[in-house]
């Protein structure tokens, strides 16, 4: 789901801080007749700045004998496990940043249903969020509840729009639905538009020491 966001890598400074320039508030238009001369007003830029979190794994020791005595490449196995752990942690931390603590709007009840997806669609419509580029991320339980709420015809139509190559498990009410085993504490479903959230990657390093 991380790829469904604005890539801010080009705005990373010194590998630690993201600085994104912004044109400021949305402009308004007026209806004539026009009084002339018009006085120009200066635009005020607003800046989006945030720090990149440092995410790491603890060092691991591989005995020298393991390089020769094991039937598999232990170093590659350890590196693969580290990459997997880092990727999962990065995804969780970015999701926390997207959801935040004060700006999210709770729409669902005790059981997730297609009506909750419709409510999310209505909320984004009210905010003039573009139709194209809307996504909905569900945890495993919400996904099960959603499928259970659909009729057989609705479920077949939903699953027919799945795209494994992009991670989309189906489309419903304008959302491309994605699945993750879990989101963050207290959140089971999250709807967003790809141009209203961003991601950025700083420097990454691996350290090794051989005896």
Map each language-model feature to its residues.
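Extended, solvent-exposed, turn-rich assembly/linker loops in the middle of proteins
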Residues: 100-169
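Short coil/turn connectors at secondary-structure junctions
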Residues: 15, 57, 131-133
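Generic, well-ordered alpha-helical segments
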Residues: 12, 40-44, 52-54, 70, ...
């Amino acid at each position: 789901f991380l790829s469904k966001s604005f890539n801010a890598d080009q705005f990373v400074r010194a590998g630690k801080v993201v600085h994104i320039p912004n044109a400021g508030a949305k402009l308004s238009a007026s209806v004539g007749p026009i009084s002339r001369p018009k006085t120009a007003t200066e635009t005020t830029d607003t800046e989006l700045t945030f720090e990149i979190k440092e995410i790491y794994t603890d060092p691991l020791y591989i005995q020298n004998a393991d390089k020769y005595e094991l039937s598999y490449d232990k170093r590659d196995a350890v590196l693969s496990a580290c990459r997997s752990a880092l990727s999962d942690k990065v995804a969780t931390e970015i999701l926390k940043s997207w959801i935040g603590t004060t700006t999210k709007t709770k729409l669902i009840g005790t059981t997730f249903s297609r009506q909750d997806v419709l409510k999310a669609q209505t909320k984004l419509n009210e905010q003039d969020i573009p139709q194209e580029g809307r996504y909905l991320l569900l945890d495993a339980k919400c996904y099960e509840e959603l499928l259970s709420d659909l009729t057989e015809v609705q479920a077949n139509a939903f699953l027919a729009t799945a795209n494994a190559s992009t991670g989309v498990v189906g489309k419903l009410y304008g959302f491309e639905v994605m699945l993750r085993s879990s989101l963050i504490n207290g959140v089971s479903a999250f709807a967003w538009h790809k141009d209203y959230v961003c991601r950025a990657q700083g420097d990454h390093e691996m350290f090794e020491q051989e005896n």
